Amino acid sequence: MEVIRYPNSPFKLHQPFPPAGDQPTAIAGLIEGLSDGLAYQTLLGVTGSGKTYTMANVIAQSGRPAIIMAHNKTLAAQLYAEMREFFPENAVEYFVSYYDYYQPEAYVPSRDLFIEKDSAINEHIEQMRLSATKNLMTRDDVIIVATVSAIYGIGDPTEYQQMVLSVKEGDTIEQRDIIATLVSMQYERGDLDFKRGSFRVRGDVIDVYPAESSENALRISLFDDEIDRLDMFDPLSGSLHQRVGRYTVFPSSHYVTPRDTVLRACESIKEELRERIEFFAREQRPVEQQRIEQRTRFDLEMLYEMGFCKGIENYSRHFSGKKEGEPPPTLMDYLPDNAIMFIDESHVTVTQIGGMYKGDASRKQNLVDYGFRLPSARDNRPLKFHEFEKVMPQTVFVSATPAKYEEEHAGQVVEQVVRPTGLVDPQTIIRPVATQVDDLMSEINDRIQKGERVLVTTLTKRMAEQLTDYYSELGIKVRYLHSDIDTVERVEIIRDLRLGLFDVLVGINLLREGLDIPEVSLVAILDADKEGFLRSHRSLIQTIGRAARNVNGVAILYADKITDSMKAAVDETERRREKQIKFNEEHGIVPQQIKKQVKDIIDGVYHEEDSGKGRRQGKNKVKVGEIHNEEDAIKEIAKLEKAMQQAARDLQFEEAAVLRDRISNIKENLLFGAE
């Protein structure tokens, strides 16, 4: 492993091998395009050609902060894991939606049904989001891997930066001032329960567990009103890591705002409320009039007393001081001016970004019309596409099948068709639909004997379920990947396929972009001649490409007629095959099978206990530690809470309840002493 540092670049690239194939020309072309000031470029890279490695080299050579946009959490997690391997010494961050579950606020007029907002926040991802914004403000060597969550409103970066607590050894500051500042930053005082986003006070020592940190806490030791020393320590064991001369504590939420901003926003909300009450009075709608007054006054009371309220994001326009219709502050506002953006699988991601606003707007309109929210709630929204275009830094679209938008906007198209491994695009075979199920059965058996895996894509959920049941009854180890499966479990299924826990994965639209499974040697596309989104030429090229990482890769398209989409997909695949074969012959390359270590691609994104191992290993037995003092008790509580959360995730509710009771007993003994 060679570590490379380019002149004037803060990045240290851990290079497992030098760029090869089309990579050197692609890297040079993109760097030249960035230097020439091209707003948009396209990297047309086939599956398995090392597009991620090319991106890493471009980032390292340019020396500029970067954001990589992906269209789903699975792909984002895969990119994040790879970028961390290339840049272990730099700030590689992960910015996706922190909701494990999210039910937005909504009103259904036909049934007079109001649905309250309900959500479950993944604390670890919330910490990573806060870490991303902190590093954007404090470091130059930052790479953010994000989903469309990046175009949704978060707190204003200017006000967020105003709310930091900067401490330095030798500073004169009273203990009560530090505590007051931490409370205003929405840190909780938890002398017993020391967790992320909290602080505790012990004599002249204040321990702060920064909201954006997963493993380090800050100890502020005071001597009278002077900061005597600052130490980083392990919040679980209490062991000191290092002494630091200065430290900046960032707020525990992106929505923290200074007190004077809150008061100004409250006055603005009152004015809008008055106008809305008058509107409903004129329209003779007393129910809506009373509803909006009651709900908004309750929120105002909370804002005056606490500085925040439930659903505070709906008042974001009043806090940011923006005019009606202006775009909300998003992650894009935190990016430095010299940032570069890569949009991975751009043929999907660009369309997805464009569609976010309209779905959100129709739901909000009902809430406004029926008095559940003030009209300003409409400005708590994702960016419209034209607004996103205005804030896009220099951008590289990355795709094997660029769509119309990329074709129209790209200043230059850089091709990366030749794979360094010499692997050739899969051979494409067309067979009749009539015998597709039985024909596929014999193909699957051939692959199983060779220790290879198979992906099967169908058109409907019902067909996928029936096919899975049928093959399962015949003794084939088969799983079905569908849209109801959450992100973590989806990653687990893909990992289990690679490990050989099953041999065949059936899906509908989930087997296309970005799935990196070198063990797959056969992709079967059922009903390939049914024209539509799932069988467009781009979809077919992407699906065929899933077998391109295997030296024996084959794609079978079951069809009774050859559609225009099929012809375009097969022709493009053949063009790429010929180019690769020619390259291999010229350079004497024998195609080599990719041997990629099987590990959890979300390693570092979700905790180890999230990886679903409990589901396969049965209940988690937790050894009870001996408790001699308060420090032992705090360690034991932290360990038991982890086990309790895992048991709940594994639906082992009785075990979770036992662990909860054990935690309660330890806390009671701490408070009142052992009986």
From Swiss-Prot:
Motif Beta-hairpin, residue range(s) on this chain: 98-121
Domain notes: The beta-hairpin motif is involved in DNA binding.
One CC-aspect GO term: cytoplasm
Lineage: Bacteria, Pseudomonadati, Pseudomonadota, Betaproteobacteria, Neisseriales
Assembly with partners or alone: Forms a heterotetramer with UvrA during the search for lesions. Interacts with UvrC in an incision complex.
UniProt keyword terms in alphabetical order: ATP-binding, Cytoplasm, DNA damage, DNA excision, DNA repair, Excision nuclease, Nucleotide-binding, SOS response
Every Helicase ATP-binding domain range: 32-417
NCBIfam families the UniProt entry points to: PRK05298.1 (NF003673), uvrb (TIGR00631)
Keyword check for S-adenosyl-L-methionine: no
Source organism: Neisseria gonorrhoeae (strain ATCC 700825 / FA 1090)
Protein name, as recorded: UvrABC system protein B
Origin superkingdom: Bacteria
The protein's role, per its UniProt record: The UvrABC repair system catalyzes the recognition and processing of DNA lesions. A damage recognition complex composed of 2 UvrA and 2 UvrB subunits scans DNA for abnormalities. Upon binding of the UvrA(2)B(2) complex to a putative damaged site, the DNA wraps around one UvrB monomer. DNA wrap is dependent on ATP binding by UvrB and probably causes local melting of the DNA helix, facilitating insertion of UvrB beta-hairpin between the DNA strands. Then UvrB probes one DNA strand for the presence of a lesion.
Similarity annotation: Belongs to the UvrB family.
Compartments (UniProt record): Cytoplasm
Pfam families according to UniProt: Helicase_C, ResIII, UVR, UvrB, UvrB_inter
UniProt record, GO biological process: nucleotide-excision repair; SOS response
MF annotations from Gene Ontology: ATP binding; ATP hydrolysis activity; DNA binding; excinuclease ABC activity
Boundaries of every Helicase C-terminal domain copy: 436-602
Domain UVR: 634-669
Annotated residues for binding of ATP: G45, V46, T47, G48, S49, G50, K51, T52
Coarse class of the protein's main subcellular location: cytoplasm
InterPro entries: Helicase/UvrB_N, Helicase_ATP-bd, Helicase_C-like, P-loop_NTPase, UVR_dom, UVR_dom_sf, UvrB, UvrB_inter
